[in-house]
């Protein structure tokens, strides 16, 4: 069982700084520029969970080619999270290939689950965008096109080994 938390983390990032997330996965490395100016609460949450090691060993449990790869659920079922929820932030960017956004179960239900866009897709602005890939699109391609079973679950899920955060 993963660590659970009673409440969202206090704001600890500096929205004026640049943050980079390096996701080491069993399929390769993805690097993303986080966007604290667009979504400070969401970036703060992702940075907190990454630094806690929350994502280590977590799989991409839902993959849809031409759409997205989704992970961040410690149970691997699509229904797990960190033990708390936090509010949505306004979405001003589009859901283009390589964007990172929060998965949710409705308004203001963000937790730990996120997705990476495999392709441009016209989603409603209900999923807070908090980052964009700067490298590793071939890793997204490999994950998104892997064979799946029921509920878009990969037959051989890719795991996140670690998420390292750097700031400048």
Language-model segments: which ranges?
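Cyclophilin-like peptidyl-prolyl cis-trans isomerases
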Residues: 1-168
């Amino acid at each position: 069982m993963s660590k659970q938390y009673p409440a969202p983390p206090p704001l600890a990032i500096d929205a004026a700084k640049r943050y980079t997330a390096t996701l080491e996965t069993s399929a390769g490395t993805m690097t993303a520029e986080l966007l604290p100016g667009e979504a400070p609460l969401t970036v703060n949450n992702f940075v907190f969970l990454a630094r806690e090691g929350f994502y280590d060993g977590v799989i991409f449990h839902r993959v849809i080619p031409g759409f997205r790869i989704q992970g961040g659920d410690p149970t691997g079922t699509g229904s797990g999270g960190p033990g708390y929820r936090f509010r949505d932030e306004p979405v001003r960017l589009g859901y283009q290939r390589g964007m990172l956004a929060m998965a949710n179960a409705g308004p203001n239900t963000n937790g730990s689950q996120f997705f990476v866009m495999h392709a441009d897709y016209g989603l409603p602005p209900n999923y807070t965008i908090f980052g964009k890939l700067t490298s590793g699109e071939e890793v997204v391609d490999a994950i998104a096109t892997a064979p799946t079973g029921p509920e878009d679950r990969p037959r051989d899920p890719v795991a996140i080994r670690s998420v390292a955060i750097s700031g400048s």
